[in-house]
Amino acid sequence: MALETFVNSEPFTFGVELEIQVVNTHNYDLTKAASDLMRLIQGETFPGNITPEITESMIELSTGICHSHEQAVSELHAIRDVLVKAADQLNVGLAGGGTHAFQQWSDRQIYDAPRFQYISELYGYLAKQFTVFGQHVHIGCPDPDSALFLLHSMSRFIPHFIALSASSPFVQNVDTGFHSARLNSVFAFPLSGRAPFVLTWDSFEEYFTKMVNTGVVNSMKDFYWDIRPKPGYGTIEVRVMDTPLSVDRAAAIACYIQTLARYLLTDRPLKLSEDDYLVYTFNRFEACRFGLEGTCVNPQTGERRTIAEDILDTLDRIAPHAAALGSRAALDEIGALANARVNDASWLRTVFKQEKSLNETVRQQCLRWRE
């Protein structure tokens, strides 16, 4: 199969995708209701899209093409409200969060769609374990070479996105010690990790053709990279975030990525090299394990600082681009999180400490989702 033609898109437009937990309202375990939700929303009018995901216990919402923080917030609220209304009719709950706190993966049912059945057959139990919930952000790129430049420039900031969005401290009734345990499920897939270091679309097409010829992949969907190009949309897709507990937090993180993209592609402050990835896996682990308190190592200078400190320094550098995009309010929220060194994982642990019940913790997640 040939690689799709890269469709040039308006630079720095963006779209947001959120995978959502579907839970019962008895003990707040995951439940099988995605098909029923899809039937109930037929005929409803809303921006963007709502689609099923790999198991019956999750559903995905996505915005249209957004230009601003204000538009993203408006669209996410509108789509969220349609889903909440349908969930109320079914007496089920919806929640953000990168993992469900106590579900058993073996109870999951694969959604009846050809691609999901194919993934289940290929990956076995990993497919059911993949009932984890992420936020993806697409960023519009003017041409394919710019997309690859942005992809590799953005990789330096992957720890920021993980730490800011982290909302998965609990897995199967256990506090994992991680801020984002969700990504441990993603790492199990053989085509996860980072994209190959190529900087021209011609070289990327050669790589893709070689991979297709091995029989390992059929399309870009088979790559579970942290950031991957999406040629049919004319975007790069940042895929490392946990789904936040609120749509407002999701919009703020998306606009942080949008503003970074404008800075990286307009100012071109980084000279890219393969050595940028020397500490990539270490930095990513630190963000997953320790959140905003994790260590971030600069691959060029060897300088070490906390991820929170690196975010605050980055916010200063990209401030002019935030003003140009109208994203100051979003970046103020990001700055507040970095200054306080708290994220949704912190909130979940606080609730559990107070309530001493993961069932009650998930119930409060459902309330947060409605805010």
From Swiss-Prot:
<dbReference type="InterPro" id="IPR050141">
    <property type="entry name" value="GCL_type2/YbdK_subfam"/>
</dbReference>
<keyword id="KW-0436">Ligase</keyword>
<comment type="function">
    <text>ATP-dependent carboxylate-amine ligase which exhibits weak glutamate--cysteine ligase activity.</text>
</comment>
<dbReference type="InterPro" id="IPR011793">
    <property type="entry name" value="YbdK"/>
</dbReference>
<dbReference type="GO" id="GO:0004357">
    <property type="term" value="F:glutamate-cysteine ligase activity"/>
</dbReference>
<dbReference type="GO" id="GO:0042398">
    <property type="term" value="P:modified amino acid biosynthetic process"/>
</dbReference>
<keyword id="KW-0067">ATP-binding</keyword>
<dbReference type="Pfam" id="PF04107">
    <property type="entry name" value="GCS2"/>
</dbReference>
<protein>
    <recommendedName>
        <fullName>Putative glutamate--cysteine ligase 2</fullName>
        <ecNumber>6.3.2.2</ecNumber>
    </recommendedName>
</protein>
<keyword id="KW-0547">Nucleotide-binding</keyword>
<dbReference type="InterPro" id="IPR006336">
    <property type="entry name" value="GCS2"/>
</dbReference>
<dbReference type="GO" id="GO:0005524">
    <property type="term" value="F:ATP binding"/>
</dbReference>
<dbReference type="InterPro" id="IPR014746">
    <property type="entry name" value="Gln_synth/guanido_kin_cat_dom"/>
</dbReference>
<comment type="similarity">
    <text>Belongs to the glutamate--cysteine ligase type 2 family. YbdK subfamily.</text>
</comment>
